UniProtKB/Swiss-Prot annotation:
The keyword Transmembrane helix applies. It comes from the Eukaryota. InterPro entries: C-type_lectin-like (IPR001304), C-type_lectin-like/link_sf (IPR016186), C-type_lectin_domain (IPR051505), CTDL_fold (IPR016187). Glycans are attached at residues 189, 381. It is a single-pass type I membrane protein. Keywords: Disulfide bond, EGF-like domain, Glycoprotein, Lectin, Membrane, Signal, Transmembrane, Transmembrane helix. This is C-type lectin domain family 14 member A. Residues 22-397 are extracellular. The gene is CLEC14A.
Length: 490
């Protein structure tokens, strides 16, 4: 176990992991409008470990060619000293080396060294000078570092063996689009968190994935993120380009300012107007912008009321009471076409109405109005009148006629059924034997009642009215009752 543990300690000492021994508080980053970003890291490590650290961050070991690239790297170095406080010179790994098959060339600016990437850059003659001339060789592989005097001012290139340790390294990242830095306005405590695992207090340009957090007035936190879409890059959840709106009217260098601080040394106006304001005629004051401002009288917007449905009640509408209206008169309601329509008085639920019927004359001119949905609405100008009789609409008339017809048909059917019942009763043969059995045995039957009975039957058979035959039968029965049975006078 002890040999293995000692071997692990030796391996960590000779081959530290990527990012080991770094100082995040001293690291810095910057981006240019071309889409290139650079980061400076303070960490003691070898050349290969520096390359791996840049790859893990999403970039590569940086080149420092002439032109904009050189200026961006110099700006990072001059932004502040490293962890040592600027007491000594610092060495930073870059992507500059000389391969085994290449020789040292004293007459060339890079002395036979070359950049690992083939990206086009500036002229090699515009590069930095060499602090020390490299050794002449055509067989050994050599690396180069960027030496910074006091950790701030770049001195130039220096040859260094690749297995030795430097004080830091430079990484480069390339993006297609970048977000311009948002103006802070009234924001404070700004913090940029770049996608290559680096925090910064300010970035002129931010790659997609950068998150900016700050505090607005009242210690309200705000956070926005740079995102890329089909159009380009923009800040998500940010309306405009100011993080926190200013309470005043002036902005200077993207921050809120007062009017006395807007004048430069020469007396010129050095501020810009905040959102909602525009520069006045004097060229120094910001006045309220007229765009989007309401008028003094206000704008009357008609309110749409939803149509009444089976599940929603009819919206109530209250009309203002006019002084010139008399009690009992019908109020007048203005329509959309500036015409006046009278509304009849409707008694409320549970109240006693003095009007037995509502008499209205339908002397109206129907006006067809086509709504946007395609339906036709008819309008009637109706007036109330007490002299004209009440009129029924078509539906009420149809119902009345139908009910009357049904009653008449029912009466006719009832009369017919009663007549048939009576007719069947008189034609029944059971009445003849009952009359013959009324006389005592041994007596002869009276011919006159028989004649009367025959005449009654004859009356029925001859089609005489049932009512007349009935009266005649009753008269004959009365005569039979007055005469005694078995009398000779009968």
């Amino acid at each position: 176990m002890r040999p293995a543990f000692a071997l692990c300690l030796l391996w960590q000492a000779l081959w530290p992991g990527p990012g080991g021994g770094e100082h995040p508080t001293a690291d810095r980053a910057g981006c240019s409008a071309s889409g290139a970003c650079y980061s400076l890291h303070h960490a003691t490590m070898k050349r290969q470990a520096a390359e791996e650290a840049c790859i893990l961050r999403g970039g590569a070991l940086s080149t420092v060619r002439a032109g904009a690239e050189l200026r961006a790297v110099l700006a990072l170095l001059r932004a502040g000293p490293g962890p040592g406080g600027g007491s000594k010179d610092l060495l930073f790994w870059v992507a500059l080396e000389r391969r085994r098959s290449h020789c040292t060339l004293e007459n060339e600016p890079l002395r036979g060294f070359s950049w690992l990437s083939s990206d086009p850059g500036g002229l090699e003659s515009d590069t930095l000078q060499w602090v020390e001339e490299p050794q002449r060789s055509c067989t050994a592989r050599r690396c180069a570092v960027l030496q910074a005097t006091g950790g701030v001012e770049p001195a130039g290139w220096k040859e260094m063996r690749c297995h030795l340790r430097a004080n830091g390294y430079l990484c480069k990242y390339q993006f297609e689009v970048l977000c311009p830095a948002p103006r802070p306005g009234a924001a404070s405590n700004l913090s940029y968190r770049a996608p290559f695992q680096l925090h910064s207090a300010a970035l002129d340009f931010s790659p997609p994935g950068t998150e900016v957090s700050a505090l607005c007035r009242g210690q309200l936190p705000i956070s926005v993120t740079c995102i890329a879409d089909e159009i380009g890059a923009r800040w998500d959840k940010l309306s405009g380009d100011v993080l926190c709106p200013c309470p005043g009217r002036y902005l200077r260098a993207g921050k809120c300012a007062e009017l006395p601080n807007c004048l430069d040394d020469l007396g010129g106006f050095a501020c810009e107007c905040a959102t909602g304001f525009e520069l006045g005629k004097d060229g120094r004051s910001c006045v309220t912008s007229g765009e989007g401002q309401p008028t003094l009288g206000g704008t009357g917007v008609p309110t749409r009321r939803p149509p009444a449905t089976a599940t929603s009640p009819v919206p109530q509408r209250t009309w203002p009471i006019r002084v010139d209206e008399k009690l009992g008169e019908t109020p007048l309601v203005p329509e959309q076409d500036n015409s006046v329509t009278s509304i009849p008085e409707i008694p409320r639920w549970g109240s006693q109405s003095t009007m037995s019927t509502l008499q209205m004359s339908l002397q109206a001119e129907s006006k067809a109005t086509i709504t946007p949905s395609g339906s036709v609405i008819s309008k009637f100008n109706s007036t109330t009148s007490s002299a004209t009789p009440q009129a029924f609409d078509s539906s009420s008339a149809v119902v009345f006629i139908f009910v009357s017809t049904a009653v008449v048909v029912l009466v006719i059917l009832t009369m017919t059924v009663l007549g048939l019942v009576k007719l069947c009763f008189h034609e029944s043969p059971s009445s003849q034997p009952r009359k013959e059995s009324m006389g005592p045995p041994g007596l002869e039957s009276d011919p006159e009642p028989a004649a009367l009975g025959s005449s009654s039957a004859h009356c029925t058979n001859n089609g005489v009215k049932v009512g007349d035959c009935d009266l005649r039968d009753r008269a004959e029965g009365a005569l039979l009752a007055e005469s005694p049975l078995g009398s000779s006078d009968a």
